[in-house]
Amino acid sequence: MSIRAEEISALIKQQIENYQSEIEVSDVGTVIQVGDGIARAHGLDNVMAGELVEFANGVMGLAQNLEENNVGIIILGPYTEIREGDEVRRTGRIMQVPVGEELIGRVVNPLGQPVDGLGPIHTTKTRPIESPAPGVMDRKSVHEPLQTGIKAIDALVPIGRGQRELIIGDRQTGKTAVALDTILNQKDEDMICIYVAIGQKESTVRNVVETLRKHGALEYTIVVTASASQPAPLLYLAPYAGVSMGEEFMYNGKHVLVVYDDLSKQAAAYRELSLLLRRPPGREAYPGDVFYLHSRLLERAAKLSDAKGGGSLTALPFIETQAGDVSAYIPTNVISITDGQIFLQSDLFFSGVRPAIDAGTSVSRVGGSAQIKAMSKVSGTLRLDLASYRELEAFAQFGSDLDKATQAKLNRGARTVEVLKQGLHKPLRVEKQVMILYALTRGFLDDIPVADITRFEEEFYAWLDSNAADLLEEIRTTKKLADDDKFAAAINGFKKVFVASE
């Protein structure tokens, strides 16, 4: 049988044309050192900063330090199985988290994996955890109120949708309670809330979730938790995961509230990672870019322009101070980034003034333009009343001979402090806040004994619901003060039936 050269060459040509290369080109490096949640790898010359890499056992890592001879990687998972000499490969992707409606009502970790035992989350949408903040032209001035339901905040330091308002105070001063009450008050406000717990005890997070569930707030809330037992990389990533989940809603024209509880622990986790990566330490051993850590997170909160859908993302970051020292490094950084701060004083808290908001040092730089007209009219003199009361209170302890004007200021101040007190998880609708503050600032409470103010308030709200519902509805819909005569008639009508205690 003769074999013709033409046939052979034709067959070879055909084989070459039909040949499909199955070679996969990937950048592979070798682990040269591992420990404390950090790995160093050699050979990943083309890896990008912030890129995901995959270890041989399937655990992912984040390339952070790009050095001359090696790459510093933070490991996002258990690192005990990773050994020196193991293979590590580039993925070509940056870290993303699952987003979308499916996460609402769930408790997830910073990687978007459910930790509440309610099964998998079926969403196909993801967003990168690091994304640029909206530009100047994509934004709009803050002008819509975010009602917290807390009289002291809505009257003195109002918050608008799209604002960043810092909540700062020592441990055990009621910071989490302020945020929870704010979330509970969003029930019928068409808001999606995201509570990010950073470095909290798991029992604390459990209590928060149960509180939200009990009050029906979990149906519009996502809880992101990186508890104290988690490795530092997850604590560092948790706030970025939370804001990415919120951005998905904001860019679709919805309103979002994100609570970061608290950023001090995130900064400590980032300091730990930076020192392990051998980055040079600065003040208080924090790395040089710790300001950027928080600024790039909080700048992603915005009120979007109408062209971008008009959505908003409001941020409530927490900072824990040591012995009330707001001039430490992290507190001053975050104060300078945010649009105001609510300062919680431990002295006030332990003296029974709760929420323990210090009206003198708390400010809201942009919330005033978002406050409803009715509230700005009734709360105009509150800050001055409180400030003069605190000043005179110190003098009044030394002498009893006070003139009538001073005594009147002290009496009004004592009643103001009582009215601004509020029970735990009892947020108040804004129309009822306006009614009680009107009664306070216009002198209707001056003849009510201080000890009876709390009872007066509770009975007044119940009386308004049954006897002056139209007045409450008018404030709610017009957002303006009704006729003075209507207010006076309602308040005097209740005072006639109110019985002071002996």
Curated annotation (Swiss-Prot):
Main location: membrane
Entry EC no(s): 7.1.2.2
Membrane topology: Peripheral membrane protein
UniProt keywords, alphabetically: ATP synthesis, ATP-binding, Cell membrane, CF(1), Hydrogen ion transport, Ion transport, Membrane, Nucleotide-binding, Translocase, Transport
Region (Disordered), start-end ranges: 115-136
InterPro entries, A to Z: ATP_synth_asu-like_sf, ATP_synth_asu_C, ATP_synth_asu_C_sf, ATP_synth_F1_a_nt-bd_dom, ATP_synth_F1_asu, ATPase_a/bsu_AS, ATPase_F1/V1/A1_a/bsu_N, ATPase_F1/V1/A1_a/bsu_N_sf
GO molecular function: ADP binding; ATP binding; proton-transporting ATP synthase activity, rotational mechanism
Compartments (UniProt record): Cell membrane
CDD domains referenced in this protein's UniProt entry, alphabetically: ATP-synt_F1_alpha_C (cd18113), ATP-synt_F1_alpha_N (cd18116), F1-ATPase_alpha_CD (cd01132)
Reaction catalysed by this enzyme: ATP + H2O + 4 H(+)(in) = ADP + phosphate + 5 H(+)(out)
Residues the entry annotates as binding ATP: G169, D170, R171, Q172, T173, G174, K175, T176
Entry GO CC: plasma membrane; proton-transporting ATP synthase complex
Coiled coil: none
Domain of life the protein comes from: Bacteria
Site keyed Required for activity: positions: S362
Assembly description: F-type ATPases have 2 components, CF(1) - the catalytic core - and CF(0) - the membrane proton channel. CF(1) has five subunits: alpha(3), beta(3), gamma(1), delta(1), epsilon(1). CF(0) has three main subunits: a(1), b(2) and c(9-12). The alpha and beta chains form an alternating ring which encloses part of the gamma chain. CF(1) is attached to CF(0) by a central stalk formed by the gamma and epsilon chains, while a peripheral stalk is formed by the delta and b chains.
Function statement: Produces ATP from ADP in the presence of a proton gradient across the membrane. The alpha chain is a regulatory subunit.
Annotated family: Belongs to the ATPase alpha/beta chains family.
Name of protein: ATP synthase subunit alpha
